[in-house]
Each structure stands twice: as C-alpha cells, then as structure tokens.
Regions:
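Conserved phosphate-interacting/catalytic interface
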Residues: 1-217
Length: 217
C-alpha cells in the first residue's frame, strides 16, 4: 500500500511540475488537423458555443450573432458539479445554455425558469465577492434585465413561430436553437488592448479572478 501511495504522489507531483513548466501555453488554442485543443486554466473546461452576445461594461446589449462552426471552441469557468453535468440543473458560473441565461426564456419555450434562478443565484455570489471582475459585473447587470431572448430574436439570431414561440425545428450548428450555448464579449473602453481582451473566453484576468474565487471557498 505504501509503495502504491508513493507512486500516486510521485505521479501527481510530476503532473503538477509538467503543468507549471507549460504555464505559457495555458489557454492558447492549437490544432491537430481541424480539431482544437488547449492546456486549460484550473477550474475551467471547454464548450462549443452557438451564440456570441456582445454587451458593454454597463450591461447594455450591443449585438448578437451565431458563432461560425470554425470558431465555436470556448474556454469557460466550471464548478466541480457543472463540469460533469449530464441531465442535472447545475449551472456553469458564467457562460451556459439559453435556459440558464435568459430570464425571458419561459416566454418563448415551455420551461419553468428554474435554471435561470439557479444560475443567477450562483452568479450573484461571484458578483458580490471580492473576486468579482468587470466582465462578471457587466454580464450580471445585463442578465438581470431578463431580455436575452428578446434581444436575440430582434437581431434575428433566433427564429420564432407565427404565434411568437421559439421555432422548434431551427438549429444552429446542428443544435436545437432553444439549447444553444451562449458566450459573451464585453466591450471595454477603460482598459488598453494590451492589458485585456473583450472576449470572455480569452481573458486571462477573468480566468485568474475565477481561480481566486474558487480557492477562497
């Protein structure tokens, strides 16, 4: 048992050493053929996004668009439970499916709105913590308005039936539009481009704030 334990400790130490030696590669997306991959920041995973929503720092909606298939690879913060979510309702901390992010989702799709409540309760805790980030604040302000579905329909990102409900047969990248995964761009005028980037999935300062937040728990 002792030898097995030592092997496990040595393996863990070697893995940590290897990770630390490659910190400069964290978050850099590379390709094997047409398949993207990256060394992930801790407490993060990847998702394939179907919709990009652009807002400003005050949480005002600017633009929505469908994500091109060759740009869907997205780094997102996760919790231990949301990272292994299958059929449960565990919300991701920031980017997620429409039913989690859209407070007006039940106006267009048969849904009880519980996923939105779970998501917002979790996001509020990050927003109120000392590890909040400007992008987290902007997204929280925007989603409180409960207008995401309306905004995306106005931009013709989502399509409706004649009765105003969301069209069931419409897809984005082959995914039912009602199940689309959303990521955010927060347009910043207060920070030079050399310090940060507007895309949440590429912002190292946002990754670091989430890592600090998770470690504080």
């Amino acid at each position: 048992m002792k030898k097995g334990g030592e092997r496990y400790v040595n393996w863990g130490r070697e893995a940590l050493d290897l990770y630390e030696k490659n910190l400069n590669k964290v978050g850099k997306i590379e390709y094997r053929g047409e398949f993207p991959y990256t060394l992930l920041p801790t407490f993060h995973s990847t998702a394939t996004a179907q919709i990009t929503v652009t807002i400003d720092e005050e949480g005002n909606f600017l633009h929505g668009e469908q994500v091109p298939a060759n740009d869907k690879f997205t780094i997102i913060p996760v919790t231990e439970k949301s990272g292994s979510r299958t059929s449960g309702k565990e919300a991701h901390p920031l980017c997620d499916n429409l039913r989690y992010l859209a407070g007006d989702y039940p106006l267009y799709v048969a849904d009880d709105g519980s996923c939105f409540e779970i998501y917002m309760e979790q996001l509020k805790k990050w927003y109120e913590s000392e590890f909040c980030h400007d992008k987290v604040r902007a997204i929280y302000y925007y989603l409180q308005k409960k207008s995401l579905m309306h905004d995306l329909i106005e931009q013709k990102v989502l399509k409706q039936n004649e009765d105003g409900t969301l069209a069931e047969k419409e897809t984005i990248q082959g995914i039912d539009q009602s199940k689309a995964f959303v990521r955010f761009i927060v347009r910043s005028l207060s920070n030079p481009l050399t310090e940060t980037v507007d895309e949440c999935w590429r912002d190292k300062t946002l990754w670091e704030k989430y890592q600090q937040y998770q470690r504080s728990m």
